[in-house]
Amino acid sequence: MSKIIYTKTDEAPALATLSFLPIVKAFAQTAGVDVETSDISVAARVLAEFPEYLTEEQRVPNNLEALGKLTQDPNANIIKLPNISASVQQLKAAIKELQGKGYAIPDFPDEPKNAEEEEIRRRYGKSLGSSVNPVLREGNSDRRAPKAVKNYARKHPHSMGEWKQWSQTHVSHMHSGDFYDGEQSMTLDKARTVRMELLLEDGTTKVLKPKIALLDKEVIDLMFMSKKALLEFYEREMEDCREAGILFSLHVKATMMKVSHPIVFGHAVRIYYKDAFQKHGALFDELGINVNNGMASLYEKITELPASLREEIERDLHACQVHRPRLAMVDSSKGITNFHSPSDVIVDASMPAMIRNGGKMWGADGKLYDCKAVMPESTFARIYQEMINFCKWHGNFDPTTMGTVPNVGLMAQKAEEYGSHDKTFESSDNGIARIVDIDSGEVLLEQRVEKGDIWRMCQTKDDPIQDWVKLAVRRARESDTPVIFWLDPYRPHENELIKKVKTYLKDHDTNGLHIEIMSQVRAMRYTLERVARGLDTISATGNILRDYLTDLFPILELGTSAKMLSVVPLMKGGGLFETGAGGSAPKHVQQLIEENHLRWDSLGEFLALTESLEHLAKNDDNAKAKVLADALDRATETLLLNDKSPSRKTGELDNRGSHFYLAKYWAEELAAQDENSELKAQFAPLAQKLEENEAAIVEQLNEVQGKSMDLKGYYLADEALAEKAMRPSPLFNEAIASLS
């Protein structure tokens, strides 16, 4: 049998899977396709890491490791749903929940006191941040808005805030002392094994990464961010923001850049509340407060103090706000600010939302205000300022007419910054950070750093670059759309890539294709001018811009990035099919618990499944899989045209109801097609059954709404309870079961 691996993840997509997967399995088995699940939720990953603490019955396999190996199989076919990129707070909450359910895993050591705790901290670190995607993404990224989705957005445009030319909103970034400012890069002339070390001022050497194997033609970079320059930057920007009377907002990606960005975030918090930290710093250290984890962790820790001392600290924190700018809010009604948690404001989602809102963010009074968007690292901050400039001059974009911006992203084999976590360090001393060839002793790259500076090494292998260029040319040819490589010749790393792109383009037939290389700001301006005229432009970018642009443009075009088609053609021949580019929607889960209404839109799952079946049809020469894929494609379009996507409002159609309509339309398409008589005969009775019982099924699905529910767990819900909640229509369940 052909096989599809369907991942079980977290939060809203995990709940949606309980409703949708039985439908997928029932339909797929008619084409000889076996659909298996693989649990890569944060709970499963934590448990897999500590088998020696568990009983035999409690142990779970390391599914992420197994899937990583599977990506090397030419027959791999994996559908990957969004998962939690856990912050420290989320990880600790998951650990606490698992311990409460009888799993005797160790506590998370905030400040490890011995070698054993260091090892526990290291092992838990594997589940922090974006730890899933780098393992599975053994290919480059092809993300685009399917035609049916784009057409729907044009006919049913989402709301867009109005931009004013006099808007004070702007982006602020460092102009010196950041990673861009001092980056060094080189392409290796041969395979080498290197180490990362810090040569201290007293002549001793501290080895930080003893052994890194590098390949011939690999691009390596060394860069650092100055702590001194960063703190001066924050002071300057906070004062400028206060004088301007606009909101201060900090935009980082602490989930992915899980070593560097929490540090960058923590420095902003300490500068903002500088007087309180100077007064209470010793006590905060004693309590083990680490504001790299946000103000939420500080408030949590001071609850242990006597009331008088706690109130004094709270007064001192509030007093700091008098001479600091107002903070942008994550949730005005609950008083949650931009500094609450580093994972609350994630740049690739927060910046597009602000731009879509006419350049405004929420203040503490629940009103919208202009803001200063602070992104310390200048490398990619400039693209957002370019878009803001464009919006101020031309006004907001029109979803009914704007063009689309598909992306071909370089990400395979942990390319660039997104693969640098294990090679990122906060310097413990002044000295020279360097990369040294172990065999020859040759110093390949070196930089002078000071205590507290963040320095890192990035790698980009040559095969992924060749594959990226090939994919860009293929997409240009298939879609007859210009491709722009967003590469800055003044950035050393990207200058190395430009040389390679120019070389590898010669390996392909580019006759009749429009392919250019532009710096990020020029590429953004060129793309926006085309978008405003309704023209399409493919962006070929590195790993970070892949992430940023595949949220930015879809949010403006479609209202969400969850409706993107996200395909990763694996370099060994298999396929990884990601369901959209959004997160795992904790607020959707909150609504389900409070009102038994799940507004998660599974369109991303429908699109990924279509591509997965298409891939299967080609790879396994499975004609029935092709019929299923074509029928699903038409059914998805019908679902959009008939407006059967989930409503945000309790009592109306939700995720479960949209799954019913998808199954109904899919069965009808299969019953109506003439390519395969066997499938036609199999699905005719189901189509009839769903048609006849439509009103009764929808009533059963909707009548359970409006009541609170308890799933007996968040990170590890009670499976029977959750399944019962997500499949509340006996009529629909029986109809799907009748297929097998």
Swiss-Prot record:
UniProt-listed Enzyme Commission number(s): 1.1.1.42
Entry-linked Pfam families: IDH
pH dependence per the UniProt record: Optimum pH is 7.0.
Chain positions recorded as Mg(2+) binding sites: D348, D547, D551
UniProt note on regulation of activity: IDH activity is not significantly affected by monovalent cations. The combined addition of Mn(2+) and another divalent cation results in the decrease of the activity.
Keyword Cytoplasm applies: no
Coiled-coil boundaries: none
Residues that, per the record, bind NADP(+): N83, S85, N133, S584, H588, R599, D601, R648
Alphabetized UniProt keyword annotations: Glyoxylate bypass, Magnesium, Manganese, Metal-binding, NADP, Oxidoreductase, Tricarboxylic acid cycle
Known catalytic reactions: D-threo-isocitrate + NADP(+) = 2-oxoglutarate + CO2 + NADPH
InterPro entries associated with the record: Isocitrate_DH_NADP_mono
Keyword NADP assigned: yes
Listed cofactors: Mg(2+); Mn(2+)
Uppermost EC category: oxidoreductase
Temperature effects on activity: Optimum temperature is 45 degrees Celsius. Retains about 60% of its maximum activity after incubation for 10 min at 40 degrees Celsius, but completely loses its activity by incubation at 50 degrees Celsius.
Signal peptide from the UniProt entry: none
Molecular functions per Gene Ontology: isocitrate dehydrogenase (NADP+) activity; metal ion binding
Binding site for D-threo-isocitrate: S130, N133, R137, R143, K253, Y418, R546
Assembly mode: Monomer.
Record NCBIfam families: monomer_idh (TIGR00178)
Function: Catalyzes the oxidative decarboxylation of isocitrate to 2-oxoglutarate and carbon dioxide with the concomitant reduction of NADP(+). Cannot use NAD(+).
Family affiliation: Belongs to the monomeric-type IDH family.
Protein name: Isocitrate dehydrogenase [NADP] 2
Organism from which the protein derives: Psychrobacter sp. (strain 13A)
Gene it is expressed from: 13AIDH-M
